[in-house]
Structure formats: C-alpha cells, structure tokens
Amino acid sequence: MKTPWKVLLGLLGLAALITIITVPVVLLNKGNDAAADSRRTYTLTDYLKNTFRVKFYSLRWVSDHDYLYKQDNNILLFNAEYGNSSIFLENSTFDEFEHSINDYSVSPDGQFILLEYNYVKQWRHSYTASYDIYDLNKRQLITEEKIPNNTQWITWSPEGHKLAYVWKNDVYVKNEPNSSSHRITWTGEENAIYNGIADWVYEEEIFSAYSALWWSPKGTFLAYAQFNDTQVPLIEYSFYSDESLQYPMTMRIPYPKAGAANPTVKLFVIKTDNLNPNTNATSVEITPPAAMLTGDYYLCDVTWANEERISLQWLRRIQNYSVMDIRDYNNSTGKWISSAAQEHIEMSTTGWVGRFRPAEPHFTSDGRNFYKIISNEDGYKHICRFQIDKKDCTFITKGAWEVIGIEALTTDYLYYISNEYKGMPGGRNLYKIQLNDYTKVACLSCELKPERCQYYSVSFSKEAKYYQLRCSGPGLPLYTLHRSSNDEELRVLEDNSALDKMLQEVQMPSKKLDFIILNETKFWYQMILPPHFDTSKKYPLLIDVYAGPCSQKADAIFRLNWATYLASTENIIVASFDGRGSGYQGDKIMHAVNRRLGTFEVEDQIEAARQFSKMGFVDDKRIAIWGWSYGGYVTSMVLGAGSGVFKCGIAVAPVSRWEYYDSVYTERYMGLPTPQDNLDYYKNSTVMSRAENFKQVEYLLIHGTADDNVHFQQSAQISKALVDAGVDFQAMWYTDEDHGIASGPAHQHIYTHMSHFIKQCFSLP
C-alpha cells in the first residue's frame, strides 16, 4: 500500500521556505511583519494549476562518462567530464513518425533506439504500449519484424542489442532488432498465467514493478518468473465509462486478500545465444530451497552475481523467514547447481524481514562476495559483507541510524545513502566507505549546502566514475554533477533560480522539523507553519497522517502541495507525526505494530495532537486529521476512538477491515486471519466497530469507484456501518477513478471539496 503520487517541489534556501531542526519551539517571522507584507499568498489555484513549476534534470547514463538529456525535444549526448554536448537525436527526426513518442530507450551499444507510443496505463507500474526501433547508423526505422502492438514489457540486454519482451503474457526474445522473434513461453493466459510480467499483487507489493525478466550481465541468459493465478479469487467492480454505455463494464482482477489463495510462482532461465527459430526454446526451472516447500512462499528478488551465477531470494508467506539461494551454471548439464553452503537465511524474531521485503544483494565483480542491508543485533538496518559460501557476515556500518540503500560498488569503495547525519531520521546523505578499511567513511554531501540540502538521492554512471547528486530539500531541487575520484563538483545541472525569483513575491510557509519524547523514545514530527508565524497566536491544526509500517512523513523534503495552500492562505498549521510503526529508526519502533495494526500507530497520532495542543499556539477546539490510503484508515480509527481531541477529519480511499486488503501487505504485518493465528486482532481493528463514536465528529469519506488497490468495498462498508448507527456524515465518490484519484477534473474537485470541508470545520471564511 502506498500513498498516491504527488508532485514534489522545493524552494531555495530561506527566501522561500525556512526549515528549523531544533528541539525547542522556534519563533519565525514574528508578529508585526504580517500587516506590512503585501505579497500574495500561495493559493489553492496555484496548487491545482501548478502555477509554480519546478525544473528537474533527468539524465540517462549510457556509459561511464556520457549521459543523455532531453532538451527542447532534442536528445543530447553530454560528456560528464567537460560538459560539452552533441545532438544524439534531433527533434526533426520524430516528425517522420506517425505517432507521438512517449518515451525512448537506447541500446547499450548505442546502435538502436526503442521508441514508445500508444501508452495505456494499467495499474501502478504496468502499462501496454507500441514500439518502433530506429537504426541510428542508417538513420531510419526498422520496418521488418516489428514489435507487436500492446506489448506489456520490453527491455534491452545489458550489452549489445538483444531484446526481450512480453506480449499476451508470453515471453519473446529478438537477438537482432530486425530479425524474427523467438517465442520462449506458450502458456500465457489473461488473468491466469503470467510469464515475464508480474500479476497484480507481485507488481504492487513485492517487485514494485511490472517486469519479471532479468538479463544476465552480458545477455547470455534471461531469467523470467511465471505466476499462476488460476486459484486466486477475482475482485470485480463496475467501470461506467462514457454515459452512452448502457451496461457498465465489469473489471476482473485476480486479487488475493488476506488468508485467500495466493498465486504460485516459478523461476526459469533460458540461454539466449543458441535460440533456433525451428525448435521451441528450452527453459530450465530453478526450484526453491527445501525450507520454502513447507508452505506458501514468494519469490522476492532475482540478482545476477556474474554471467553464470544467479541469486534468488525466497520468502515464506509468513514473512519472517527468507532464504537467499545462490546458483551456479553447469556448462556440461545446462543446469543451475545449488549448494547448502550458498544458502543464506535471514530471519526476524520481532517482526518481518527487511523493510518491505529482503534487501537486494550487491555482488563484487568476481561474484564471490556480496553486501546486503540487514538488521544488526540492535535492530538497525546496516550493511553486512558476505562471502557466498559462508553463513556469517561482517557488518561494515554501525550506529543508532539506518542505511537506506547501497548505491554503487567499486573495487575500492561502497557508496550508500543513510540518515546518520545529525541524528535526523528524515534526512538522506551520500557516504562512501573504503573497502580495505571500514573505519574510513566519508560523507560526500553533508556539508555541501546544509541549509538548502539535507535530503539527497544519487545516480551513478555505469562504472561509478561520475555521479549526479539530486537534492530534494528543504530548498528547491538542486542537481549537480560530481567526479568520483576526488568528489569534486564539476557543474550545476539545474538550480531552479528562475523559480526562486518568482517565489520571492509569495508569502510562503515555513517548515519545522523536530521531535518529542514519549516513553523515553524520540518521535519526529514536522509542521508547515503559516507565514509570519506567531507563537502568541492560536492557529487551527490539521494532522496529515499516513502512519503505515515503515512510513515516514517527517522529512527534509520540500513540497508544494495542499498543505502549502492551507498554511499560506488559510493560516492553518499542517503537522505530520511519525509514531510507533514508522521506519528508518530501528526495528524497535518499526516492529512495535507487528500483528497489531490499528493500535499503537492510531494511539500515537492522538497523543501527538495532544502534545501539539500544549505548545501554546494551537487552538485545541480546532484540530482536524486527514489521510489517504493507510492514512485514511488511521484517520478513521482516530476519529472513531472517541478521544475528544479532534473536531473533524477526512478519509480518502481508506482500508476499513484488513481481511479486505491484499495478502502480501496485510499478512506481512498481521499474520493470517485464522483462529490459530491472529483472527482476534483482525476483528478488533475494523473501522466499522467504532461507528458509534463518529457521532462526536464531522467526517468526510471519499473513494474512487475503480480503485483496484483499496477497493470501494472498504468505504462502502464504513458507510453502511455509519448509516446503521445513525451517524450524520459526508461522503464523495469519484466515478471510474483509481486509488490516486488523479485525473485532471477529479484531482481539482477532490482538493476543492476537501478545502471547503476543512474551512467549514474550522469556521474560516
């Protein structure tokens, strides 16, 4: 379960947004300045119309020293060291195509470019599209042996220009762009058998991707997963489409709910060098380790260590036990050989393995060692070095902070992102550690621009000779290019200076990032504070909540969103709090909600609101809460708790009963809804059981009728329970909208409607 995608924007330094990271409440722009400030505020229209547009710099590395960047619809090739560019593909080249190009992908050898058009979105990551291949040497389209329309996924091999694609749930390989395709699988069937692509639950909850294809580093082998959903129950819902449609369409998706039959999975590998168009290709299955065969299991990661060594991670349905199985190719038999010494077990005794799944391994170039993020004995996620045939590993990082991700591995260094700097869980910085001396660690971003940039991500060139640093806040996004040998900044790629100048004329809110201590534990929060914030005044407070396991809402990212409008124009404080169950602060906090969803994370939001109301600047008669998805669930549970703290709240696309949500996500945290396992906590964590307490609050319930993720059923049952209890409440549905309610008209309508509700609740004009 994830929150709907929202545009993330930022502001330069103190000119547009002030971020305070401190323990005591800090006074900002106090008092008398407000009357003299004639600048306009950031309005709801500004948010809905995206009046202030941030610039991004999305490059694509094509080698260790060159990258592509699209500018004025020309695709330019840049040299990283010197910054000079040449036209890789002119805008005029696209004029000869019959279709509008949605995206492109260049073959690793630079000879061909794959052009995508007719894009049709399916679920969160999945889509279908049509493709043409352009020969860059001949400067012409390849017209023979074209890729079929409505292709579900396509990818180049890591070297050369082989192609693997999925069409009608079957896998195909092209060894040359202009040659005929080799059909690899023959079993594909809609809503039943998926080859090379994920079914709904694997796409949403395990791979976070549609692809289930994995090329070996040189393209000799192709691994692919097969999912069998024939026993998975279908979710069915109406899709109303145009008003001229007399009978609505019925959408059907194999969707395993908690405790229901899951898809089964198999993993195959095929050698692509010897494909013969006259004979069917032979795929070799790699079966799971014996420890997985005692019950249901998931395939959760596939990583190639080298050309003839593959790592598979398998996870039991009760997600506290996983096995990483490293297999080697036997040339004489064509089989992938297992060894007990090359099986690595990862377990959790306090919750589940990993943050959402076991982390992927990062292998050394010889494939003999790998680095992986796992929990240490203190429950913090850190990097451990493994030898492939040894059970124990050596931690190379440590501390009361967490490694977020391994970003690059070279002969001498490992690069990673962590939140170590200044003990702030909501920050992100880039570090490198010397592999022959783990005590030699350097932060490459911490002191570059600490006022503007405290939240970084990174993109490395093919062999990590260069990297792009991407600063997401608290100031405006800043993109810089660096040389790895000395970490020197070579140039600024984008600094959003034009936007900063525009925002000088707007009264922008400030952001406070701080913590409170509850039961001797630090819990972080953020507040978006109105312009000219004055601690002697009383402001209405809106809690913006998500609160799902391993979530984080208090961070150093700058956003231009609905909260910006509420603070700037309506003088509402918008706060978020990371309580028990939240992520990136150790397993003790994250696993507190294990098998207990709907308890501590709900209680902590209520307690946070109480603590905020004691700070002196919150009007305790005007406190509201709102959230989307898991946040909608927590909002509803909070309002149904009868605490007397909240006047009103908004729940968008909420879960209402955990048996209604998908198996992978729900069972990770709750186990199975059976009397032998955790049925009592399933029953005690429903919104409907709290219906009577909604008489004490004002409640707005919102859902899209075509939500494939959190089904409309969830809100329908809340509505039914409230009606049965005689509760007066407001509700809004959005016809044919999915979980994001993101189409243009619906997006504008929902935020306008919610704004009216909040203003009415707070008695604002």
Swiss-Prot record:
One of its GO terms (biological process) is negative regulation of extracellular matrix disassembly. Its EC number is 3.4.14.5. The soluble form (Dipeptidyl peptidase 4 soluble form also named SDPP) derives from the membrane form (Dipeptidyl peptidase 4 membrane form also named MDPP) by proteolytic processing. N- and O-Glycosylated. Residues 1-6 are cytoplasmic. Inhibited by GPC3 and diprotin A. One of its GO terms (molecular function) is protease binding. Disulfide bonds join 384-393, 443-446, 453-471, 648-761. It is a single-pass type II membrane protein. Pfam families: DPPIV_N (PF00930), DPPIV_rep (PF18811), Peptidase_S9 (PF00326). The active site is at 629 (charge relay system), 707 (charge relay system), 739 (charge relay system). It comes from the Eukaryota. It catalyses: Release of an N-terminal dipeptide, Xaa-Yaa-|-Zaa-, from a polypeptide, preferentially when Yaa is Pro, provided Zaa is neither Pro nor hydroxyproline. It is an enzyme of class 3 (hydrolase). InterPro entries: AB_hydrolase_fold, DPPIV_rep, Pept_S9_AS, Peptidase_S9_cat, Peptidase_S9B_N, Serine_Prot_S9B/DPPIV. GO terms for cellular component: anchoring junction; apical plasma membrane; cell surface; endocytic vesicle; extracellular region; lamellipodium; lamellipodium membrane; membrane raft. Monomer. Homodimer. Heterodimer with Seprase (FAP). Requires homodimerization for optimal dipeptidyl peptidase activity and T-cell costimulation. Found in a membrane raft complex, at least composed of BCL10, CARD11, DPP4 and IKBKB. Associates with collagen. Interacts with PTPRC; the interaction is enhanced in an interleukin-12-dependent manner in activated lymphocytes. Interacts (extracellular domain) with ADA; does not inhibit its dipeptidyl peptidase activity. Interacts with CAV1 (via the N-terminus); the interaction is direct. Belongs to the peptidase S9B family. DPPIV subfamily. This is Dipeptidyl peptidase 4.
